[in-house]
Amino acid sequence: CLQFGSTCFLGDDDICCSGECFYSGGTFGICS
C-alpha cells in the first residue's frame, strides 16, 4: 500500500495504507 504522504488520486482510498486519500481541491491528494 502507499505510505503516509504518498500521492493518490480520487477513488484511490483503498491503495493508501491508512485507507484514506486526503483532498484539498487539487488534481491529486495525499495518503493520510
From Swiss-Prot:
What keywords is this UniProt entry annotated with?
Answer: Amidation, Disulfide bond, Knottin, Neurotoxin, Secreted, Toxin
Q: Which domain of life is it from?
A: Eukaryota
Q: Sites of the modification Serine amide? A: S32
Citing just one GO molecular function, the answer is: toxin activity
Subcellular location as annotated? Secreted
Keyword Secreted in annotation: yes
Role, per record: Elicits hyperactivity when injected intracranially into mice and produces paralysis when injected into the pedal muscle of freshwater snails, Pomacea paludosa, but it has no apparent effect after intramuscular injection into the limpet Patella opea or the freshwater fish Lebistes reticulatus.
- This protein's domain notes: The presence of a 'disulfide through disulfide knot' structurally defines this protein as a knottin. The cysteine framework is VI/VII (C-C-CC-C-C).
This protein is called what?
A: Conotoxin sr7a
Which species does this protein come from?
Conus spurius
